[in-house]
Amino acid sequence: MATRLIDREDNLVDRTICHSWVCPVVITCLSALGGFLFGYDTGVISGAMIQLREHFNLSYAYQEIIVSISLLAAAIGCPVSAVLSDYIGRKIVIIIASVIFTIGAIVMGVSYDKISLLTGRLIVGLGIGVASMSVPVYIAEISPGHMRGALVTLNTVFITAGQVVAGIVDAIFISDEVNGWRYMLGIGGIPSFIQLVAFINMPESPRWLVQHGQTQKARVALQRIYGESFVTIQIENEIQRMVEALRDVELSETSQATSDVVQNSNANIDEEDCILPGKTSQFSEDARNRDNGLPSVSESSCLRSKLTLIRMLRLKTTRRALFIGCGLQMFQQFVGINTVMYYSAEILSMAGIGGMNNNKKGENAKIVWLSALVAFANFLFSLGAPWIVNTFKRRLVLYCSLTGVFLSLVVLAVSFQLITSYSIPVSVVESTNVTAVGVNIHTSCSKA
């Protein structure tokens, strides 16, 4: 009965806001700039490295450090972002990520030695990690139910779009052998600055506000997101759904037959321990919430303390879903797509693309444009991914995509083995002394 009632409320809300899609889409696109920055950083370093290794005389080991340092920093930024977004809000964390990325792009653009370049990559990596954790959550929590699936996938589309734009930027500035790499790396600060300015006026996640007992602010946020057609009763229904979803997590946990120390300690928490002293304004909010069947500020705080990773691992349903989701993400990274994207220009160069061209600028331009083509193929297929996922079974799509990746990696590995075994290097033209060659020819003719 309750499920049917919620379904009817969902349909009512969805019909009301079906014409108010502009604001959610705009907010999602501005949020997905975080994904765009991740994709841009992934793609831009491929072409920039062609100039960086010559400008700074980089060894292969140092090139790998420059590429991987941002990923290491992102791995640090992700868990930090998860904690911060729960305590200070999704919006603030996204703003912080924009500031970090903007600073990192500026540092890379004005780098004068290898250490400053490495520092810029480190800062950018932190921004990527912070954004990668907070942006998808924010998009999911501000999206209307009937649009949530499509809007969440926009973040992935923006990642691949960032890779395409990075390839085009690389191709445009590759001819500038002195400062081209500065433009490539520094331009990434433009979309991050746009996101920074735009997010100052963006609404906070309504779900986060409800979770923290700020239901009045959640009402205002919903009104801004869904538009004027979203009337008061429907706003209350939406907030009630959020509250029920949060309470479902609590009920699922308490239904588990566990009695460990963590649960006992939480069970002994008195409501007064959750109330912050000096916050007298919360009591009027508590009264309004109780009248509407919503949790008080103190109840929300206690409820929020239960929504931790440890407790997710203790629940069978959430634990299984968490392991499956994290496992799929892990294998997605291990299949090697990042290696191809980060080193696509290097791979094409090693394969001999443009190797017979004595014009170095023309050779590099050809390599970078082909690298952009690889990124465009990735972007093109990501556009069709939402339709494919909604049309075919998820497991079938996963099997087909993994099979394609496996075959592609096999072809790539075999190709490099054949090039190494049966071909001469064609991407490097050895310099020769024309005068010495002439002397040798003259000497040979004289002896004859």
Residue ranges and their predicted role:
Residues 225-235, 249:
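Short intracellular "coupling" helices and adjacent cytoplasmic loop segments at the cytosolic face
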Residues 230-231, 242, 337:
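Generic hydrophobic, helix-prone segments enriched in Leu/Val/Ile
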Residues 68, 235-243:
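Short amphipathic alpha-helical segments embedded in low-complexity Lys/Glu-rich regions
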Residues 233-237, 424-426:
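Flexible, disordered linker segments and immediate boundary regions flanking tandem C2H2 zinc-finger modules
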Residues 2-223, 251-448:
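Transmembrane-helix signature of 12-pass secondary carriers
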